[in-house]
Every structure is written in structure tokens, then in C-alpha cells.
């Protein structure tokens, strides 16, 4: 089932997405999010996560950086904490906030 879903997502990216234009308010895009979710969490859970993400992606959504939970990108977006303090704050680094402009 996983290869079929990945193939359908690839077909969407190649055949339909160029004609529909970029409308996603999130980074990674919803189709990239769906691909990552299926790869990292399997067909059933990944499909559910992708469906929930599609429901969050609408014209009134704030958008922004929203990686798939449990992936390497998510780990860098949400640093581990130690004794209630961020590892980055403990090392003297300023927190990084990513804001994307609204289209």
C-alpha cells in the first residue's frame, strides 16, 4: 500500500501540481508533508496525518513551518529540553523563529 500511495503522490506532483499552482501556506508543502508522513509513519497513520494537514491548510490558516512529527526536521524545529531550559538557550544560542510571508 505504501508504494502505491507514494506513486500517487508523485503523479500528483508531476501531472497536477504545476497546473494548480502553489497554494499551500505551509512549509513543507502539503504534498511533501504527505510523502514524508507515509515514509516515516506508514500508509495508514501517514495518510491520516496528511488528511489532518489538508484540513489545516485553508485560506485563513496562518501557515508557517510545520514538519512531520517524529522526523529529523521536526527534531531540529523543536530542540530537546534539559532541566526546563532549551539546549540552545543553555549553550547561549538565541532561539530561531521562522515566519513565512502570506501569499
From Swiss-Prot:
Primary residence: membrane
The entry's keywords: Cell inner membrane, Cell membrane, Membrane
Membrane-spanning intervals of the chain: none
One Pfam family from the record: YidD
Function text: Could be involved in insertion of integral membrane proteins into the membrane.
InterPro entries: Membr_insert_effic_factor_YidD (IPR002696)
NCBIfam families linked to this entry: membrane protein insertion efficiency factor YidD (TIGR00278)
Similarity comment: Belongs to the UPF0161 family.
Protein name, as recorded: Putative membrane protein insertion efficiency factor
Lipid bilayer topology: Peripheral membrane protein
Location relative to the cell: Cell inner membrane
Region feature (Disordered): 68-91
GO cellular component: plasma membrane
Superkingdom of this protein's organism: Bacteria
Amino acid at each position: 500500500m505504501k508504494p502505491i500511495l507514494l506513486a500517487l503522490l508523485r503523479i500528483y506532483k508531476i501531472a497536477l501540481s504545476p497546473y494548480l499552482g502553489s497554494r499551500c501556506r505551509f512549509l513543507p508543502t502539503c504534498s511533501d508533508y504527505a510523502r514524508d508522513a507515509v515514509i516515516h509513519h506508514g500508509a495508514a497513520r501517514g495518510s491520516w496525518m496528511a488528511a489532518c494537514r489538508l484540513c489545516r491548510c485553508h485560506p485563513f490558516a496562518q501557515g508557517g513551518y510545520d514538519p512531520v512529527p517524529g522526523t529529523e526536521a521536526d527534531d531540529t524545529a523543536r530542540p530537546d529540553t534539559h532541566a526546563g531550559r532549551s539546549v540552545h538557550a543553555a549553550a547561549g544560542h538565541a532561539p530561531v523563529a521562522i515566519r513565512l510571508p502570506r501569499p
